[in-house]
């Protein structure tokens, strides 16, 4: 500690001692009402040891003294979140160009969208063993290298098979990053900033999604090679992260676990600036020693986690949060935002892409709100409020699609079906019925605001941009004749309701349910189980991500568009009950203290918020424990 810092601490100690002495002089006489307790409080304060006073003073003095190095480490780490957001968001706009140029059918579109997600799920499940063996830093370097290679393959792809290979490589990279980055940030951050810095990762995810939507819009005017720029630009942040991590240190906790104690002390001291690290270092080392004693039993870590009640409960909470994040429909919204807007009646592809960027921007801005709220409101309240608002927004979105369905245009023109064609499409009477069949499209003309000469006909199997036969079987011809072709949407005056619903959804989702599952999972596991716990929860996130993204179009087909969003609202409501009953508050607690929150049965751990405002709750007075009042605690602190 510097000379100036030492003088400041000594001054703070003198001030605190004076304050304690003044408090003792102000105590009532023993015979006065409350005198017995006041005397005991005075004796309690007098019995505090100098070391306790010094720790209290250092906490007060050092609270805001965090080196810029910690923020730099968090920022370079969070570039993994940016890649996560960019690579999962950019495919939405790129697909509109790819399906035209490479004439992709529905199956190949689904493969390219979900291929990266599936690979990420596999990588996330294996990532626990990977970053436990190689270290957090090496795992992040590997992730950024994979993203760089995958992006280059995508930019140079000449066919759909190469595109799929590139998406798989990118998926492996973002899967490793998805569960390693939050752990690294949590382990290098001081307790008072941990939640905020981990939330920065989610801020970068949403920033990546917003940037991807802007890139999609900008390059949507390049019909031939625009998708190459969209998919290839992800290599730039991947290279920056790789170069940055060549100069960043390994996690001190991982180094201590591997026996590299001197290096760990040096790095921990560098990351804590003017703060003394002895207490934190001893706490980490002691927890590791205890965990290593418990780990002497044979068997995989996941088996030990499941057999040990506190970690089993933590795993249920962590995986449950990730599951409900996906079941509430977030990646349906993000992957299919342009498609959802088209479903609501937006005809032009470019307009749908630019409108989708509004939703991505909303997600980004309100994630910033979450960064500000996480250490003020706490994890539990923020998650609960976010999920409650998300449920309401999904209901509003569903009602908007229901309203559009109620005014769906009728089929007024039934062309003669060629003898070799299926007649299923021509049998539908309304546009919304036609749209729910993936083999059909809606051909129509517009007179003022009225839809006229409308028919439901089979879609061209080689391209969804035109019909298999009839007036709309040639895009150039039907546009010249004033006709319109709609696939997966119906013309409606209520298309604005979908945009409002999407924006409202992200206003509520982004501050809480977006970052909190990752933040909570980075905190709730003991060190010996942290990598495996985060790998399992990230894997659950990706698995349900795949399930929801692969089934959305089929769900909309069988349940209707509004039925699909009512279903997601139901899942979100169940998640609300889960958060209320099972999620404890971890705000302001050391990572080594959080395990005790799961000592009790699962659905009582979130029954009440913790009193995190007091550092000293009990002191020893003449051989017995005395509970300090709030005022006592504030005086000591």
Curated annotation (Swiss-Prot):
This is Proton myo-inositol cotransporter. The gene is Slc2a13. Residues 15-38 are annotated as: Disordered. Residues 1-65, 136-137, 189-201, 250-313, 374-382, 519-538, 584-637 are cytoplasmic. GO terms for cellular component: astrocyte end-foot; cell body; cytoplasm; growth cone; intracellular membrane-bounded organelle; organelle membrane; plasma membrane. InterPro entries: MFS_dom, MFS_sugar_transport-like, MFS_trans_sf, Myo-inositol_Transporter, Sugar/inositol_transpt, Sugar_transporter_CS. It comes from Mus musculus (Mouse). Disulfide bonds: none annotated. Glycans are attached at residues 422, 447, 474. Pfam families: Sugar_tr (PF00083). CDD domains: MFS_HMIT_like.
């Amino acid at each position: 500690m510097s000379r100036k810092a030492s003088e400041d601490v000594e001054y703070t100690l003198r001030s605190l001692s004076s304050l304690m002495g003044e408090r003792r002089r102000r105590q009532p006489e023993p015979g006065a009402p409350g005198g017995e307790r006041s005397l005991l409080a005075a004796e309690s304060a007098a019995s505090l040891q100098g070391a306790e006073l010094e720790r209290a003073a250092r906490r007060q003095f050092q609270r805001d003294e965090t080196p810029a190095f910690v923020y730099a480490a968090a920022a370079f780490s969070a570039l993994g979140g940016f890649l996560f957001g960019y690579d999962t968001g950019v495919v939405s706009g790129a697909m509109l160009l790819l399906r035209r140029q490479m004439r992709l059918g529905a199956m190949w579109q689904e493969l390219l969208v979900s291929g990266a997600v599936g690979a990420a799920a596999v990588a996330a499940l294996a990532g626990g063993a990977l970053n436990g063996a190689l270290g957090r830093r090496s795992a992040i370097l590997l992730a950024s290298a994979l993203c760089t290679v995958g992006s280059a393959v995508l930019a140079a792809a000449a066919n759909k098979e190469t595109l799929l290979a590139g998406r798989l490589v990118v998926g492996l990279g973002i899967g490793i990053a998805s569960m390693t980055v939050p752990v690294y940030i949590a382990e290098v951050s001081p307790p008072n900033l941990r939640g905020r810095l981990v939330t920065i990762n989610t801020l970068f995810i949403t920033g990546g999604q917003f940037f991807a939507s802007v890139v999609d819009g900008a390059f949507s005017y390049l019909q031939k090679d625009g998708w190459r720029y969209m998919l290839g630009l992800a290599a730039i942040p991947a290279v920056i992260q790789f170069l940055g991590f060549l100069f960043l240190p390994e996690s001190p906790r991982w180094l201590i676990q591997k026996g590299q104690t001197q290096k760990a002390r040096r790095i921990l001291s560098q990351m804590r600036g003017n703060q003394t690290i002895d207490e934190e270092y001893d706490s980490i080392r002691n927890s590791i020693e205890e965990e290593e004693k418990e780990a002497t039993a044979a068997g995989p870590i996941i088996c030990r986690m499941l057999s040990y009640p506190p970690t089993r409960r933590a795993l249920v909470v962590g995986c449950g949060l990730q599951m409900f994040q996906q079941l509430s429909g977030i990646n349906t919204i993000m992957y299919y935002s342009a498609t959802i807007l088209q479903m609501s009646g937006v005809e032009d592809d470019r307009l749908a892409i630019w409108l989708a960027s509004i939703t991505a921007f909303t997600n980004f801005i309100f994630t910033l709100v979450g960064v500000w709220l996480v250490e003020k409101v706490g994890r539990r309240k923020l998650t609960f409020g976010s999920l409650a608002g998300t449920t309401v927004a999904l209901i509003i979105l569903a009602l908007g699609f229901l309203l559009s369905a109620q005014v769906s245009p009728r089929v007024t023109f039934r062309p003669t079906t060629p003898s070799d064609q299926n007649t299923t499409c021509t049998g539908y009477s309304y546009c919304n019925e036609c749209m729910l069949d993936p083999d059909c499209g809606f051909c129509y003309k517009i007179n003022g605001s009225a839809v006229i000469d409308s028919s439901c006909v089979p879609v061209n199997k080689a391209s969804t941009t035109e019909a298999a036969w009839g007036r709309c079987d040639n895009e150039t011809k039907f546009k010249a004749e004033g006709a319109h072709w709609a696939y997966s949407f119906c013309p409606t005056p209520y298309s604005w309701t979908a945009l409002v619903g999407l924006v409202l959804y992200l206003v509520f989702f982004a501050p809480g349910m977006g970052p909190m599952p990752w933040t909570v999972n980075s905190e709730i596991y003991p060190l010996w189980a942290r990598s495996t716990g985060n790998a399992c929860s990230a894997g659950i996130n990706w698995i349900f991500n795949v399930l929801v993204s692969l089934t959305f179009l089929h769900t909309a087909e069988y349940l209707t568009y509004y039925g699909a969003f009512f279903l997601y609202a139901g899942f979100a409501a169940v998640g609300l009950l889960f958060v209320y009953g099972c999620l404890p508050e971890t705000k302001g607690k050391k990572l080594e203290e959080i395990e005790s929150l799961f000592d009790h049965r699962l659905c009582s751990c979130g029954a009440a918020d913790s009193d995190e405002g007091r550092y000293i709750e009990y002191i020893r007075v003449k051989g017995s424990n005395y509970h300090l009042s709030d005022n006592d605690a504030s005086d000591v602190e």
